[in-house]
């Protein structure tokens, strides 16, 4: 089966909610194509969809899917294709999802650099979505107390990502627009 056929088969399984089936398809693809980041990324995406839809705890209170493996597969895909904005954004998103805020912020800075390095790669959508997720995660972690040290440290980062996600080249550029006389 070609890579496109495998991806189509896995996508169809995901659409039907058969995340475990998609993960199995990606496992087979990874075994035969260990140097292709698409397999690792696809497996991690399917696993994350499963957790988001079904939760990750079984009847005994144990993780059904190893979150560390999900993060590792996202990291591997991003590392194998360091200029791929989608892979890097997905890795950052998973880090936010798994409450790894400092690591997520570092990954988002890499995403900013990917956007700066190429006029053909638009990372604004990824940054805006990540900023929203980051603020949500910080609020949950701090019980909506933005005076805590972690909130004070990372809310400004999230706001910066949001501003860049709106298409401004910098916070300073956005401030110039805010200070313009109407």
Annotate each predicted stretch with a short phrase:
Residues 11, 45, 52, 93, ...:
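Residue-level recognition of tetratricopeptide repeat
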Residues 34, 82, 116, 163-167:
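Short coil turns that delineate tetratricopeptide repeat
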Residues 2-32, 53-56:
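Alpha-helical segment of the N-proximal tetratricopeptide repeat
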Residues 8, 42, 90, 126-129, ...:
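"A position-specific structural signal for the A-helix of alpha-solenoid helical repeats
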Residues 48-67, 96-104, 136-151:
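Short coil/turn connectors between adjacent alpha-helices in alpha-solenoid helical repeat scaffolds
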Residues 39, 87, 120-123:
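TPR alpha-solenoid repeat register
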Residues 29, 76-77, 111, 158:
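Canonical positions in the second alpha-helix
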């Amino acid at each position: 089966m070609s890579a496109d056929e495998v991806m189509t088969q896995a996508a169809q399984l995901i659409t039907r909610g058969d995340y475990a089936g998609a993960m199995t398809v990606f496992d087979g693809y990874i075994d035969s194509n260990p140097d292709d980041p698409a397999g690792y990324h696809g497996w991690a995406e399917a696993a994350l969809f499963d957790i988001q839809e079904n939760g990750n705890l079984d009847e005994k209170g144990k993780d059904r899917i190893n979150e560390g493996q999900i993060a590792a597969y996202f990291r591997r895909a991003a590392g194998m294709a360091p200029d791929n904005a989608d892979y890097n954004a997905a890795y950052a998103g998973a880090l936010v999802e798994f409450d790894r805020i400092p690591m997520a912020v570092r990954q988002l800075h890499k995403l900013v650099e990917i956007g700066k390095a190429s006029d053909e790669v638009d990372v604004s959508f990824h940054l805006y979505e990540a900023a929203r997720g980051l603020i949500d995660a910080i609020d949950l972690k701090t019980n909506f107390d933005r005076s805590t040290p972690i909130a004070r440290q990372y809310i400004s980062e999230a706001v910066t990502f949001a501003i860049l996600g709106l298409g401004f080249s910098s916070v300073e550029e956005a401030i110039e627009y805010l200070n313009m006389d109407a």
